[in-house]
Each structure stands twice: as structure tokens, then as C-alpha cells.
Amino acid sequence: MAGSFAQLARAADKARDTMLVPKTALETPPLEIHTLGADALRQPAQRIGKVNDQVRELARDMLRSMYTAKGIGLAAPQVAVYQQLLVIDLDLENAATPPLVLINPEITAASAGLDTYEEGCLSIPGVYLDVVRPTAIELSYRDEMGRPRKMKADGLMARCIQHEMDHLNGVLFVDRVTDQAGLQKELKENGFQSKHVQSVS
């Protein structure tokens, strides 16, 4: 029995390692990250029925593209793949820290307390504005091996998860900005058009 347990433990460690890719910029990232104005960003994502090698390779390509763009989170619709898949890494400086892969994530609870914090997005480069979101959340999801998981998150992790999950519904952080004057200014200065914002605030 001990041997079986050890085998399971080694298998779990190996599974975590499958998502470790170099946290360095590539000359040519494997996936194109679409920007504000692209139809891809407004398409809802579908649940993933089976977590297989194809899904894991997509997650790795998303990570490679995210690291190249120096981001901390990326959702599949940002690369024109309409599946419920997110990758997040808040520790870009530590090569040994595995990223978080969330498949079919669902927020099951959110704090009544709200927090205001500046957000940016790889799909809207150069634009940084305050967004109000719940301070803490609880969620369920499947990991890169298809196993059901639950987690609690607060602070930056909670914000990042909520931001990336918005992408799965075709919502961008600029849609939640309440400072319209600041939004117009930031968009104009960075070459984006306000007509592509779909306010949900």
C-alpha cells in the first residue's frame, strides 16, 4: 500500500510539472493575443468536456504567449479559442513556481466587501484604470489533469481570476470602469476607440 501511495504522490508531482514552461520571452510566441476591437474578445467560451493532451498543450502555449507579453493572466478567448480555460502566474520571477491552470471555473461565493484596484490587460496594452470587484472569492474548477478542485482566493489572485473569468463571457475590464473621462483619455492615448467598450457598470 505504501508503494501505491508513493506512486500516486510521484504522479501528482509529475502532473504539476507538466505546466512548467520557461518564463521567458520568445521571439515568436505560439499564439496571437487579440486586442480591443477584435470580435474574438466578445465571443462566449464553451465548457471543456474532456481534459486531454490537446487542452494541456493549449494551456502551455497560452503560458508561453503570456510570458512573452509579460502578463500574469490569460484567457483562451484572448487567443481566439472559445473554451473555458485560464492560466495565471503571479510569480513571474520564480521559474520553479508552477502556474495556475483553471478549466471550467465557476465562482461559488464572493465577499460582500469590495475593493478598488488598478487593472490592465494584455488585450488592451497601455491602458490602466481602477475597477471595483469583490475582495475575496471561492471557486470550483478542474485542473490540468481534469481533476475537480476548489479554492479560496483574495487580494491580487482573486482580482486576477475575476478579470480572466470575465473574458470567458466576452467582458473586458474597461467595460467595468466607472471613470468615463479617465477611460476615454486612456483609450485615446493608446490608440483604442471607445466604441469598442460595452459598459456593464
Curated annotation (Swiss-Prot):
Domain of life, source organism: Bacteria
Reactions catalysed, as given in the entry: N-terminal N-formyl-L-methionyl-[peptide] + H2O = N-terminal L-methionyl-[peptide] + formate
Regions crossing the membrane: none
UniProtKB keywords: Hydrolase, Iron, Metal-binding, Protein biosynthesis
HAMAP family reported in the protein's UniProt record: Pep_deformylase
Family per record: Belongs to the polypeptide deformylase family.
Function: Removes the formyl group from the N-terminal Met of newly synthesized proteins. Requires at least a dipeptide for an efficient rate of reaction. N-terminal L-methionine is a prerequisite for activity but the enzyme has broad specificity at other positions.
Protein's UniProt name: Peptide deformylase
Native source species: Synechococcus sp. (strain CC9902)
Gene: def
